[in-house]
Each structure stands twice: as structure tokens, then as C-alpha cells.
Amino acid sequence: KWHVEQHSFIPWQQAGSIEAKMEQDGVNYRDLEAKGFCTITSHPQGLINPEEVYRWFLDYVEDNALDVVFFGYDAMNMSKFVKALEANTSFPLMPIRQRTSELKDPTKFLQTLFIEGNITRIDDEIMRKALINAVIKEDNIGIQVDKMKSTYKIDVVDALIDAFYDAMYAFEDYAITNNPTWKVEHMSQEAVLDWLKNPESGLLDEY
């Protein structure tokens, strides 16, 4: 099974205040922030602060000892954030074009996971609302998610689809996570020594 979680960054510039934003969206963002599901922007004018997003992300990776195998993103308004990741991390970054030809397969994969019950999630109001607000639309190329109404928020669903752009191949033999070289590069020193002694490494055949 797959498991998904989200963390949203909440701007309030257009609404005028976070209180107005909560009333407009019908979501108690202060309560959800206390539960760890979102961060209300600290920007004095209510704009998203890329530095705040960047620091949160790196802290999350470090605090949870994550080995990032793929970072897919919508290139729109992400240049500063991605440049910081490129300069300071070795994460594999990939811009994903937000068009049907690119998104139809991960969209179908995610839809199938939910239908078959092969995905779990935390009881998180932001993700729940995004999933409810998202609808599948089809054209002559394939399927893609869209908003039920223009004012609805589905950013979390868009992010999940971007993540599954590569993740849907994770258990295939050709996936990067199944590449022996990649495995060694992402092992601890102890794990590397164990791997070198393992017949499956193929290195023992040379001696």
C-alpha cells in the first residue's frame, strides 16, 4: 500500500487577513496549523514566503531521516525554491508540465489506488477537502483533474499527481530505487560494507 501526507502553506493576501481567509474557505487554518497540517505564512503582507517553505521542507526531511528519491514540481512560481534545492541538496528534481499528456497516467494511477483501497492518508481536513473538490475531466488525450468550482482548492491533489508521476514506477525493476548503483550511493557506511559482502552485489565474483 501507499501512504500520502501533505503540508500546505497558507497565504491570506487576497483575503486581507487570515481570519477572512478562514471564513472564505470554511477552514480553521489556525487549528490545522497547531496539528501540523499547514503553516500560515509569516509574511507581513500575507504572501507565500519561499524561504519559509524551503526551511520547512529541509527540516522535515532531516527530522524524519528521509532519503528523497524524487522531487517533482510544477515549475510555475517555483524558480527561487528549486534554485535553492539545486544549490544546496542532491535531490533529484524534475519539472512536470501541467498538461494532460504528462498527467494522464499518474492521475489514472492515483484514481485506481483510491478505488482499490491501496492508499492510506491521515485524517487531514485540507487533503480531504481537496479530494472532494477535485473532479476528473477527459479530453481526446486522456484524463486530468480539475476543480468542481473555480473557487475550490485542489492544490494538494495536483501535488499528489506530480509525486506519482515517478512514484508509480517505484516497484518496477527499472525504477531508480532498484538500481544497484543508486542503492549504494544512498546507503550508510555500515550498509555499504554489508552490501559489499553480499553475493547479490556481484563484487565477490571477481575474487
What are these regions (language model features)?
Residues K1-Q98, K108, E125-Y207:
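RNase H-like, metal-dependent nuclease domains and their acidic two-metal-ion catalytic environment used
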Residues P95-I122:
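Short alpha-helix plus adjacent loop in nuclease-associated cores
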